[in-house]
Amino acid sequence: MHTVIIGGGFAGIKATLELANKQTGKITLISNSPYFNCHASLYSILAGKSKRQSKVTLSDIFAHINGVDIVQDEVISINPEKNIVRSKDVAYEYDKLILSPGMVPDNLGISGVKSHTLSIRNLEDIDKLRKRLEVNTKEKIAIIGAGPAGVEFAGALSEWYEAIDEVADITLIDSGNRVLPTFSKTASRLASRKLRDMGIKIQLKRSVQEVKSSHIVLNNGVIPAKNIIWAAGETLSPIITKHVQYFGIEENRVQVDDFLEAYEDIYVIGDCAKASGSGTADGAIYMAEYVAKHIIHTMMGRKSRPYHHKPDIKSVPIGSNWAYVEQSGIYVSGKLGSLTRSEIENRLYRQIIPRVQAFSALNPYS
């Protein structure tokens, strides 16, 4: 059996490892990057840490795993009738296909986002921003989007300015009525307090109408800023949106059945799946484990139990020694939250990357 897996994030790597360990046949992992980016240390390069510390090559992860081909390529089409996926130059036949491409930025149709904002999705983005800020530390900064990415990055930026003995002028903007809208109201309240304690201004119920090179046009005014960071809006990967005739789409996610199957012999896992656990690293790993086990059961003629994921663990750090973590109405915050989050990340990263690299990624300031 040949399983093709698209996506080199948590879900894709974990599914590959699980299937390879059970010797299910040939496995091809296709990723458009040779690296797995370690989000735990992503923003630490603001403090000047080497980018090498924050990424691990896929070839290193699978160096001692047999039966796995790692391919750096970009799949642009899927033909489920013929069980083939294609890149620009290569056709890959599959018996089982696992899609875990993650999500991509969405400018939400707002003029100027693409040309006048900076992204913070990968290491190169962060490094580029740091170098830009070093040229003029006095320029105002606006972060559009008060979800986990925007909140975390606001805290990291504030600490960086403090470390270089500068005063940051950071404004966090969101169209909603609270920060961290997918978390509990307690999380929003505590996170807002922490952000304000760090000197970060919060503008809520402010929808962005247009982005210019020197300011943001809102529904009720203008905010001047030359460094404008986009942390709002994401959508499905083109490999999904180009093939909606095969997939059901609900709330900007791919519909899957009780076994995470979106089409015959095609499974969708990770952030882009409409399933419990979507959007979290913990959920991505659990989905990957489930799909691998289900495929093995199918090979053996056994039935699988329907997919079910425990309530999500949600967490967000604000600075290097403060974090908020919640699950099922129970939460911790502050220094204890930071320690708890570190333990959770330690468990997750050690499931997919070698021990030495995991330690380096999880201790970016050491």
Region spans (language model):
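Predominantly flavin-linked oxidoreductase catalytic cores and closely associated redox partners
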Residues: 113-198, 202-204
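C-terminal auxiliary extensions adjacent to catalytic cores
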Residues: 320-366
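Internal hydrophobic alpha-helix adjacent to the cofactor/substrate pocket in enzyme cavities
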Residues: 162, 282-315
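FAD-site-proximal beta/loop scaffold in flavoenzymes
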Residues: 114-137, 224-289, 293
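Beta1-alpha1 glycine-rich phosphate/pyrophosphate-binding loop at the start
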Residues: 1-68, 152-182
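FAD-binding core/adjacent interface of flavoenzyme oxidoreductases
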Residues: 68-142, 218, 229
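A Rossmann-like FAD-binding core segment of flavoenzymes
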Residues: 70-73, 77, 162-255
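FAD-binding beta-loop-beta segment adjacent to the flavin cofactor pocket
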Residues: 251-267, 304-307, 320-330, 337
